[in-house]
């Protein structure tokens, strides 16, 4: 009995949070081995009240709307199971971070786990792309290229993230997290390591050939120009110089954004038209959480092969209202963009790590918002857990500041 009397769930929850952040990009399933026990231990921890943050009510509103949408799903049992293991666990992970990350040392431990995971993912991506031992053939990388449109593009880097677009979204979030720490005025040896990591992240981002990720990266440059230093606008001259002088597959992929010759561009436009029809016909509850792939065949006018399964609309702004209805979409987007607003307040008013995490939070929200215009990377469990986890981490400093103020008053 004495063992249980001195048992401290909080310590174990913290370690499990660190492990979860490390495992998230490495496997779409492995991180559950640390996340589920963390949720269970937090539930047992009666001494620590849960914190939902300033935007929690909007998150709860989205959970409620998505739950109600299950009633109109063509497969209620599937939608319910999906709802329990995706949005509910996203929210649980989000709450865990806001509840248990209480000081800068704990924030730094999370960052170490994130950066260590990023190093592993980058190394694996480079080894994979180098085609050591015929790895690209074994991993079916050819499934993500269009040889008819891009005959010289033989493979795209995707590392551990299932496909290149998801890998691009992951890289954008880590890049957004790294950049602010390079902007600190203090010269430290860590900045050299951050710069090396950033260089490899950008290198890998280029080799994903993910056009949506590239456009999102340009949006980050605009944000740096607006919120930090106008000299960052010079980076656009570098991009223009590369596009004008280099005529390889990078340039071809980028220019293809502005035409419908590429099959993926035409497919997206057709998907958006079909998804908009879903929103028009089901404005209140949507078509049911997780049911897009079940309902899409009824709206399909583009894809001739009936064996092709379409899981999402490749557009966040259409996907969400389509599956949960317009009220649910309002809750979702207030919750989503609200993190950028709260992070901006942390950037303007915070001190130390809270300030720089605030800037990271702004960049992460912006990157995923732009990326969501032509894709829906948050469909992936790993990417969604990562995004909401980072969003919570980047505003967790606001809770730390409040605790310090309350402690001072006492």
Indicate residue ranges for each PLM-predicted region.
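Juxtamembrane membrane-water interface segments that cap and precede transmembrane helices
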Residues: 13-17, 146-160, 269-270, 305-318
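Alpha-helical transmembrane segments of multi-pass inner-membrane proteins
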Residues: 18-20, 35-38, 67, 92, ...
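A membrane-periplasm/extracellular boundary helix in multi-pass inner-membrane enzymes
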Residues: 71, 123, 129-132, 208, ...
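Transmembrane signal-anchor hairpin modules in multi-pass inner-membrane enzymes, especially those
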Residues: 1-82, 102-115, 182-192, 344, ...
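Membrane-interface catalytic loops of GT-C/OST-like multi-pass glycosylation enzymes that act
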Residues: 77-78, 82, 161-164, 209-212, ...
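Transmembrane alpha-helices of multi-pass inner-membrane enzymes
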Residues: 36-42, 231, 359-410
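Membrane-interface micro-motifs in multi-pass membrane enzymes
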Residues: 25-33, 82, 159-171, 321-325, ...
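Long extracytoplasmic/lumenal interhelical loops at the membrane interface
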Residues: 259-273, 285-324
């Amino acid at each position: 009995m004495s063992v249980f009397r001195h048992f401290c769930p909080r310590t174990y929850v913290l370690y499990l949070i660190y492990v979860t952040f490390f495992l998230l990009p490495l496997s779409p399933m492995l991180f559950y081995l640390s996340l589920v026990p963390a949720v269970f231990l937090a539930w047992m921890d009666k001494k620590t009240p849960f914190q939902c943050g300033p935007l929690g009510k909007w998150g709860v509103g989205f959970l409620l709307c998505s739950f109600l949408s299950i009633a109109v799903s063509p497969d209620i049992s599937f939608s319910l199971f999906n709802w329990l293991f995706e949005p509910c666990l996203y929210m649980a992970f989000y709450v865990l971070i806001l509840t248990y990350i209480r000081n800068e040392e704990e924030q730094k431990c999370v960052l170490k786990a994130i950066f260590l995971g990023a190093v592993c993912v980058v190394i694996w991506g480079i080894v994979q792309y180098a085609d050591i031992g015929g790895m690209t053939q074994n991993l079916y990388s050819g499934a993500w290229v269009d040889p008819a449109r891009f005959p010289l593009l033989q493979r795209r880097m995707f590392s551990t993230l299932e496909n290149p677009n998801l890998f691009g979204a992951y890289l954008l979030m880590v890049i957004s997290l790294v950049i602010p720490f390079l902007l600190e005025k203090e010269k430290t040896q860590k900045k050299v390591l951050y710069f090396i990591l950033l260089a490899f992240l950008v290198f890998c981002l280029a080799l994903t050939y993910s056009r949506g990720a590239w456009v999102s990266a340009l949006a980050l440059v605009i944000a740096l120009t607006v919120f930090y230093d106008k000299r960052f606008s010079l980076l656009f001259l570098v991009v223009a110089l590369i596009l004008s002088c280099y005529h390889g597959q990078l340039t071809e992929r980028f220019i293809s954004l502005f035409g419908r010759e590429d099959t993926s561009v035409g497919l997206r436009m057709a998907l958006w038209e079909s998804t908009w029809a879903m929103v028009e016909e089901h404005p209140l509850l949507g078509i049911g959480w997780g049911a897009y792939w079940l309902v899409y065949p009824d709206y399909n006018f583009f894809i001739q092969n009936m064996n092709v399964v379409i899981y999402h609309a490749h557009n966040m702004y259409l996907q969400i209202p389509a599956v949960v209805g317009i009220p649910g979409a309002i809750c979702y987007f207030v919750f989503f963009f609200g993190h950028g607003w709260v992070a901006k307040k942390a950037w303007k008013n915070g001190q130390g790590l809270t300030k720089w995490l605030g800037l990271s939070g702004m960049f992460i929200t912006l990157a995923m918002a732009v990326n969501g215009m032509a894709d829906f990377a948050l469909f992936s469990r790993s990417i969604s857990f990562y995004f909401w986890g980072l969003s919570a981490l980047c505003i967790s400093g606001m809770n730390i500041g409040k605790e310090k103020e309350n402690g001072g008053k006492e």
